[in-house]
Amino acid sequence: RKVALLSFSNPPYNFATVALLRGLAEALEQLDADSSVQAVCLQAEGKVFCAGADLVSENGFGASSEDPLREFYDQVQRLFQTRKPIVAAVQGAAIGAGLGLALAADFRVASPQARFAANFVKLGFHPGFGLTHTLPRVIGPQHAAEMFLTGDRYRAGDVLPWGLIDRLCE
């Protein structure tokens, strides 16, 4: 039995795209089917975990579908269907969709440099990635409301007592 390491990369900020989410979902489905894998460690390459959804580049949000929002959420839903335990290793910014990706994991381990934000209010749109369900469930409605309504960034050490991360490590 083993822990599988699943790394993703979309430099420089590891923005979430439909293609990136599809790749993660496909990899997680394969790992679910592998009886030798007990758990998955999800990590990003580079200094940033995921700085949000790619809303502007030609490879971003709407690049792969006539209904990009539907395609994006279809891939997000696939991530949440994983049966094996997932530990997210968050080494940098986890903003917007990046926060959602971290919350798709069962556990979150973060470096002191990690930053978390649900900055949707600053962008003028509704929180995505299932965050209106997952964030209050993990950190409680009061802290979730604070994150949603301010859009502020929080250091890993600040959100450890809230339960947003499970461990703080170098």
Enumerate the predicted regions with their spans.
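Terminal peptide-recognition signature
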Residues: 6, 23-24, 42, 54, ...
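A secondary-structure boundary/capping signal
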Residues: 9, 44-45, 51, 91, ...
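Short strand->helix junction
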Residues: 13-14, 48, 125, 167
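Glycine- (often His-adjacent) and acidic-residue-rich active-site loop
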Residues: 22, 36, 43-78, 94, ...
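Crotonase-fold acyl-CoA enzyme core
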Residues: 80-170
